[in-house]
Structure formats: C-alpha cells, structure tokens
Amino acid sequence: MDADWDEVTRIAFPAPGSNDYPRPATALAFDTIAELLWAGNDRGRVVSFYGRDLQRYTAFKIHPPSEGPVRQFLFHDKGVIALGTRSVHMAMRRGPTLWNIRHDEMENLQCMSFTSKGASEIIVAGFQDTMFVIDVVKGEIVKQKSKYICAATRTGCVDLLDPITFKTVRSWQAHASYINDMDAQNDFIVTCGGSLKQQAAQTYMLDPYVNVFDLKNMTSMKPMPFPPLAAHVRLHPRMLTTSIVTSQHGQMHVVDIMNPNTSNVRYANVMSFINLFEIAPSGEALAMADTECNIHLWGSPSKIHFTDMAIPIEMPKAEEPAPMLDWSPDTPLSSIGMPYYREQLFSAWPSDIISDIGAPPVQLDPSFLASLKQMEWGFYGRNSRGLRRNQVEDTRACMKPSMQPPKFLSEKARESAMSYSAAVPDPKVEQVPESSTDELESLKPEAPPIYRNLEIKYSKFGVDDFDFGYYNKTQYAGLENHIPNSYANSLLQLIHYTPLLRNMALQHAATACVTDLCLLCELGFVFDMLQKAEGSTCQATNMFKALGATPQAAPLGLLEEETHVPSLSTMSQGLSRFLFDRINHDYRSINPISTTLEQTLFNLPQPPTPDELVSRVLATSAVVTIKCMNCRSETTRPGTAQVNDLMYPPPKGSARGGRMHKTTFSQVLKTGVERETASKGWCSRCQRYQNLQMRKTIHSVPAVLAINSAISSQEHRKLWATPGWLPEEIGIIVDQGQFFCFEGEDLKLHLQRGMHNITVYSLIGMVVNIESSSPQKTHLVSVINVAHADAAPSAESKWHLFNDFSVRPISTAEALTFNAAWKLPAVLLFQVKAANNKTNMDWKTKLDTSLLYQDLTPHSDEKTYHVLDLEAEPPGPDTIVGLDTEFVSLKQPEIQMNSDGERETIRPMSHALARVSVVRGQGEHEGEAFIDDYIAIREPVVDYLTLYSGITPGDLDPRTTKHNLVSLKVAYKKLWVLLNLGCKFLGHGLRQDFRVINIQVPRAQVIDTIQVFYLKARLRKLSLAFLAWFLLKEDIQLETHDSIEDARTALKLYRKYLEFEDAGILEAMLEDIYKVGRATNFKPPRKDDQVIQRTDTPFLSR
C-alpha cells in the first residue's frame, strides 16, 4: 500500500426500489476482467459500478426479495455468477440472464468457488449436507484456485476437502466459536473469527489476531496480532506473503505473514461498522461497505484500477435527437417522409441511364503474383491472364456465381401452361453449367461454385417445389442438406459406394433385427434408398435421428447443434471412427442373410461368421509393443483399429547443397499404420512415470482401409497440394509384423516380379473439406469413383463430385487435385481391388418377413387391424396395398420478411411420423387393415395437428395409449419389407407420405390417385374428400382425418379409375370433375343443418 493511498470515492448504496429505504450491502466483489465493482443487498438485487468514480452501470434481481440476501460473486469471461440463499444466477455483465439454477436441497447456500483451473464448473455449499457442482459454460476459467477446497464450518473449524472425492484431508480449529472471514491464495489460508467471552450472557467478541495456515506443509503458522480486533482479512493478489486486515471501525493493517510484528497502518473514515471488505485483482484498489449503506473505494489516485487486462465495457448508446431540417429548394426529397403513392415518381430513372460504380478489384491468382518480379517502381511479369493490353475486366460479372438457383417447379409449370410448350426446356435454366476445361477448378484461388455450399429454397408448397433435378443430371442420387447433422452426407455417400460396406449394411437390414438404435440397419435403409432413387434426391432423416439419439454421439462431438469441435473435418473424422465401430458392433449382433460372395472373395472353405467377416473387412489387426526407455522392459496389448490416422514426417529445413527428400503417400500411410510414438507413461516395473516408446506390429490389414487425413499444419496442406500426390491404387504387403506400401512405378514393378503376396487396393473416394470465405460457409463434399460400385466393371474411372444434392461428373485430375487454401481431404477409403463391382443381392431373395406376421397386441379387444395370414396372404410383386399416414409437427416453420416485404420461408415445418395404416388392396378381405401402428416419438411435439391427423397427445404416450404403439424402426421396417417384396403402394398424395416416412419407392410400385385424377393443363390437384364426394358419393374427413378410412377411400377411387379407363370415358369424367370443382371451389358441399358425429376408427372382428 503506497503512501498516497486514500479514500478515492464514497457513494451511497442505492435502495432496492423507489419506495424502499436504503439497505446495507451483503456481498461485495471486484470483477476480475472488467473495471467493475459488484454489490448485492438483502433483497436479492445486484448492482455494478464502473471505474474509479463508481459510476452506476447495471442493476438486476437474481431472486425474489423474500429469499434473502445475495451471498457472493464469481466472475467468468461470459458473465457474472451471483449466489443467493436458494439459487445460483448467471447474467451477462450488461444484465440479461444467462441461466438461473434452483434445487430442492438448496436450503441456505453460503459460498461457492471454481472447482479447478481450466474447469468450467463451480462448487456451491451452505448449511446443508450436499455440495453442488454446477457446469457454468464451456470456456476458459480466468481465475485459478488452490489444490484443495477450503471450507469454514459453523464451529470455527477450517476443513480442507479433496476436490474430487470431497473428503476431508485436513482440519484445523481456527477459532473458538465462529469464523467471520477467510481468504485462501497460493499456499496460505488466513482467517479471523470470534470467541465466546461470557458463557452466561452468550456474548461473542472478535479475536485480536489472524490465524495463518500453510497448505504446502499442512501446518498452522504463527498468528498475526491485531489488537483492534480482526473483522476482515484479504491476501494481496500480487504480493504472495502480504495480507490486509481491517477492524469493524475502519482501522487497516498491511501485514507480512512472515514478519507479522511489523505493519503499515491506515484509517478509513467510517461513521458506523464495516461489514464487507474486498481487494481488487490488480491489488491497486480496496472496497469497503458499512452498515450505513455506503461504499468506500480506496487506492492511489494516480494509478487506481481494478484489473490489469480489463475488457471494454459495453455502454448504452445515446439516443440521437431527430435532425433539424431546413426546408429549402436545395433540400433533397429523400430526407422527408414520403406518403404512399400510386403513380411513378420523377426520380424513378430508367435503367439505361444508370450504371454501376465502384467495381470490386480483380481477384488475382496467388501463383500469378508469385511469378512477378519486383522493381523500384512496382512489379512486372508475363501476361498470362489472357487479357489484351489496357483491357478492363468486368469484375462484377466474374464475381457472380456461375450456378444460379433454379425456378420453383410450380413456376415452371405455370410458364409451361401459359406458353403451351412444356416439352421445350430453357437451356439457360435446365442445363447445369460445366466448368472450363482450360484450368482445373481445384487450382483456383477460391472455391468455385460447384464446390460451394448449396441451400434449398422454399416456396409456399414446401421443399417438394424445389427443383433438385437442376443440380443433378446423373443416375446417382444426392442427399438433402437442410436436416440437422447433414454434414454426414458426404461420409454416407462414400460408404455407400464402397461395395463391401454396402453389402454388409443391406445384408444386416434384411435380417430380423428390430433394435431401435441400430445404425447399421439405418445405413442399409439409406443405401437402399440411394440405389432405388436413380438420380433423384434422397434424405437421411431417420439415420440422423438415430445418430442423434445414440448416447455416445453427443459426448464425442458428433452432433452439429451440441458440438464445439472447431471444424467439420474433425467432426467427419470422429464420425468415421464412430460409424465403423457401430458397424463392427451391430453386424455381430445377428447372423447375416448371406455371405457366399465374401466366402468366395476371401477364398474361405465355408461362409465366414459375423466376427470373422467383420475382422476381415474392417479391422487392422495389430499388437502394440510398449517399451520403457529406462528399464528396457516391454509389454504388449492388442492394437486393433478400424480407422487409421495418417502420421506425417516432422518438418525439415532445406539443407544447402543437398536434395530435399520426397515424401510419398505410401510412406505417410506406413508411418500412420505402424504408428511409432514416444510419450510419458506408467512403468509397472519402475513404479513411476517414464519415457515410453510404442510401436505397432501389424498382423493383417482389412479389405476396406479407412484413413483419416489428420491434417494439422501448413506443411501437411502443402504436401496434399503436391500434384499427383494421392495415388488411385496402392499395393500392401504384410510380412513378419511389418507393413509395406507401394504406389506408382514401384507397385507395377512388384506386380511384375510376383515375388511377394501383394494386395492391390483401389481408391474409392474421399470426404473433402471445402473452406470457403465469408459469406459462404465451410462444408463437406465427397469425391467418389463410382466405377468401383457399378454392377458392371468399367475400364475407365468415373469420378463424381457429391455436393449434397448436387452431383456431377469430374475428371480424374480434378478429383485428385487438392488446394492448400480451400480443398483438403478429411476421410479416405481404399478397398481391395478384387472386391470392386462385387454386389451381393442375395438379401432380396432371402428377406426376413417375419415382422409382417407378428401381432404386437394379440390380446387387445380394440384392434383396428388383423395381420396377414402367412399361408393365404403372402405379399409379392402382384400385391396392391393401400397406404396412408398421419404426421405431427416437431418444429414450426421459420419465416422472415425479405427486402421486398414478402414472406420468405427459411425452414419449413418439420414433421414426424405418428401413424401408419396399410390396408389390403385385393382378395377376400379387401380394404381391411393389416398394419395400424402408432409411433413412439422421442422428440418433443409442438403441434399434434389433431384437426388434420386425428392424433391426440394421449395416442403417442405409452402410459395412456389404447393403440398399437411401436418404435419408428418397427413401423419403417414393415413398409421396407413390403417395398422389397415388390408390393405396389396405393394412396392419395403419397409423395408427402414417403417423404415423412423417409423411404424411396420406385415409380413402378406407386399408384397415386392424386395423379390418376389430374389434368396437367388445369394446374390443380384434387383432394381426397372432394373426389370421394363426387365419385363415391361419400363424405369423409368431416372433423379429423383417419388414415385407415383415407387408405380405403383411395382404394375405392382406384377401382373407379379402372372402370372409367376400361369404358374409355376417363378424359370426359376428368373434365366433369374439374367443371364441378370450379363451381364448388373444389370442396365437398355441406348441408347447413348437417350434424356430424365423428367416431374413432372402427374395431375389426373376425
């Protein structure tokens, strides 16, 4: 404490409200990262003061006034944490609440502290048996605490608690009766308290000393005398052995713990008692609060500040007064508010006299700039940009993306109907622009349009109105990207085009597996969709829902909405490890349908077991040898891995006069697979931590070699950007525990010699990270050689770029060229060349259909369905089944107003499947349901859409439902089995049903009555209720929808359609239907006195 220290500011602590009287502060603390002083009172109100003048900054309540005082403050980089008697409250420094936590066992909280350095959690304690550890936010802790938790008890004891187990490590009796104040810092604890002076009168008095305890040696030290009776004590934050002690009347002593007999004395001019005392983190300020509701700030007037590295304080913006306008002939019209007008203004200049100014600068290639030579007046070089001398480049046209968003399908339909030329497409719109052949897209300085992140646009008709076909002219299906966790689209595509993995997924999905969160089944369902789509766009909604519900996914940082992983590349690599582990686990759970192809491929005497097949396809079998560098002892453990991380050589400086060593992909892969590393670890022989050396001995490599690129430095990026660095084929030899890898000419030489048992692997493809600059978002694409997955082998490579729903062919050079600035691989898959084009379709002929004949509620008297008869009703390609579903809403649509004042849909309403009904379409029991499943939904439902779905909250609750409630997996698999048996699905508006179910049905297996009763020239599709009223003379959907009733009605309409077609009057009937529809507004008329009593789905009895 310098000689010029004195009271700098004194303010009155504000009253809790305008009608209340001032109250003393109950908590006082300096902010650790801002120039703020915080105080709280006994009414739960928190107030902050800014700077040396204690200017009032913010004020808010942390709990109701009846809950008592504010106890303590802690500070985090995101806000301030305030402790009440029954709650913990965190708010931003400018006031808004971040969170407020309460608990039934929070009875009388007294104190809190951060648990440890680097942990974003606090421990809260009080006069109760339970301590609470609260997770604050994920971020950096700005204040370090000691090794132990120091706790003061009611009886005057100081207990040291282990922060992990909360057990008492050491205890001291500091004071006879109670502890009034305590502080801990570095290796010292200081306390001041009181003792009972008169037993009969129960009179307590503060002790005339301060106790000191040494945490390093776990001993008590010589007390510091303080004759004025010590009321408060604080350790100096900068001087390790200095403390400041104060009495209730304002006498302050600055005392050295090691020399307590000498002190520096100051006096604070207070008219009452001091009840709070704090020192700033900088050590340059003191704050005291007295019982007369005053706050005193002490320090050196010339250098007082609260913290050394203070963040700027966000102050409220001053409201700008309205400008004064002087009306004159020179005043611009735009400065005055304009009324609404209907005629064109004179200021509306025609476009031919308006020109753009301030064109953006030319984007120059970094390689072109590097080739220029510097002179005193600037740079010069060869003109390699293709422009003539003094020619100006139109940079506005260059910056416009070459791939403009397409028109909505409804817009195209209207334009086609108006021009009567629907068969002639507009080449400017329909044709996807092709990249220039002069230069590879991957060599451009920034990501070109074909690699950029694409967004789905929504019209009032939803996502079905978006023209996905504009982005994909190939036979290979893309995936929609507006679903949570759709960053995994690229990895799903890569696995799908790996034949061995696709075979495993489809074989497993065709078994009797009904495990709810089986990701291998979900992969099989997605792969089946992609195969059946034939170039249409699919979605992996059910797969991502299962991934999100898997307990291990969130802790591993695999979910987009809950992760704080810095890059999508890291998430994709983590997902590859997780999915391969799940494939390994799920495939072993049940015997596959058929493994004859794998038996032939691996040359086995009998079909492999699930364990054997998983090991041969996925696992790099190895043993890790751990060697202690001190005692030279060695231990071994299994080191099998499904995914290998590449390991790059350390960076080396270029030696003068010597040649730089060329690093090949094969060398990096060998280093990554064998993985020789050194680290600190426990040696059981030395009984202490030693330097350990670890190395893998490789026994076998899998048929599918999954590799994470593990790029972490600029040197790694430059290595990948080397032309031709990634080979399309590699050769691997495993001999006597060593792994050898060859590529290019070395591979050809080994194959010609034939001396070693070398296995050739083909590059299937890779997940590529595209790092785009703002406003584009970084995202993932996949680059895949689909030739290895086609049914027939191809002599040439067929590289394709899968950018979510955009799919296009690219050249081999484009596929294997990377750019250190924006295009780098994250995950690579190699497969044994002998397995290319090997597709096992035995699962279709041996499909497990037992689920169709299982009655999950056999003893219910209120059944609305009867399952199929195994003998009399086997479904097949000639079977027609009526289908209808009901949905509920999980998320409301996100809508915003655009710059034109129009409503624009950012994200449409999110639906979930709630009920699936399937009825027989032929036979003796035609129209009778054999599936009527209600779906148990995990996600919170925001709207049951009861008016349209007939679903009520009790229908989907396992505790109250009267219906057949099943998991989404069971309901989906029944439909998937029917689909792969070749059944035809009949219904009305099935496109939306299939979308919510998340299933892809070929057109040949769909009979949609909304299409058969549709005139394209009318641009109006007819509702089921209207068709039923006009053609069947039936009234349906009077109050709510019933899926069984709707499926039966669609079946009856289809029978009518067949009658009209056989009679040759279909076109005439359609004209009559539309004619009557226009007169009734395409709605079935209702009689005014008609009273409708809606009932539930009728029960069936046989």
Swiss-Prot record:
Matching Pfam families: PAN2_N (PF20770), RNase_T (PF00929), UCH_1 (PF13423)
Residue ranges for the region (Disordered) are 423-442
Q: Which GO terms describe its molecular function?
A: metal ion binding; nucleic acid binding; poly(A)-specific ribonuclease activity
Residues in Exonuclease domain copies: 881-1054
UniProt GO cellular component terms: P-body; PAN complex
Where does the record place the USP domain? 446-833
Location of this chain's protein in the cell = Cytoplasm
Q: Which sections of the protein are WD repeats?
A: 20-59, 104-144, 269-308
- Region Linker: list its residue ranges: 308-445
Asked if Metal-binding is a keyword of the record, the answer is yes
Leading EC class: hydrolase
Keywords, alphabetical? Cytoplasm, Exonuclease, Hydrolase, Metal-binding, mRNA processing, Nuclease, Repeat, WD repeat
What does the sequence similarity comment in the record state about its family?
Answer: Belongs to the peptidase C19 family. PAN2 subfamily.
Q: What is this protein called?
A: PAN2-PAN3 deadenylation complex catalytic subunit PAN2
In its UniProt entry, the species of origin is given as Chaetomium globosum (strain ATCC 6205 / CBS 148.51 / DSM 1962 / NBRC 6347 / NRRL 1970) (Soil fungus)
